[in-house]
Amino acid sequence: MKPATPYRIVAVISGPEPHRTILDDLLTEALQRIDGQHVLVRGRPHDPNTVRLGGLTCVPHLPGVELAEHMRNAELIVSRSGYTTLMDLVALGRSALIIPTPGQAEQEYLGTLHEGTGRFLVQRQDNIDLGAALIAASMLTKHARIEEHPHLERALDELGTLLG
């Protein structure tokens, strides 16, 4: 497998409409104003179209392994602040700019919770500043990638069997 193209910013969009499309439009515009090569993963797995806009490549979807490699190599990751997304970022040992989906109480809570941790930057959907995020991201605490722990996984499986 060839190595992934190193993108400066990897942005991953998810969430319910209309906020998914609103964020798509906001990030498409903002990413075109930032120097470098970027990728915007639009969260549309059934859309066959990849679009290039200058240094921005907009893709409908990426396989998990490819997305993880792009995220590991990016200067900045931009995503929603859903629980699963945050856990994926922690597992990769990566910080990110997180943008809670407006009206999604869990994401707004998680954004507030993580705002001061040194792991994530938080911006509101109506106030995105990628330039400021790039500067701030360079000062975030570096975290180790969480490695797989087969003994722990086996113990949890056994515990689940005993409880189930």
Q: Which residues fall in each region the model found?
A:
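C-terminal amphipathic helix plus adjacent low-complexity
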Residues: 131-164
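Donor-nucleotide binding loops and adjacent catalytic segments primarily
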Residues: 1-76
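Nucleotide-sugar donor-binding patch of glycosyltransferase catalytic domains
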Residues: 95-140
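Structural motif corresponding to alpha-helix initiation and N-cap regions
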Residues: 21, 61-65, 83, 108, ...
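Anion (oxyanion) recognition and catalysis
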Residues: 32, 90, 115-116
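A donor-sugar binding/catalytic signature common to diverse glycosyltransferases
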Residues: 66-109
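Short amphipathic alpha-helical segments
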Residues: 23-25, 51-53, 89-92, 109-111
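Short Gly/Pro-enriched loop/turn and capping motifs at secondary-structure junctions
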Residues: 18, 45-46, 83-85, 103-105, ...
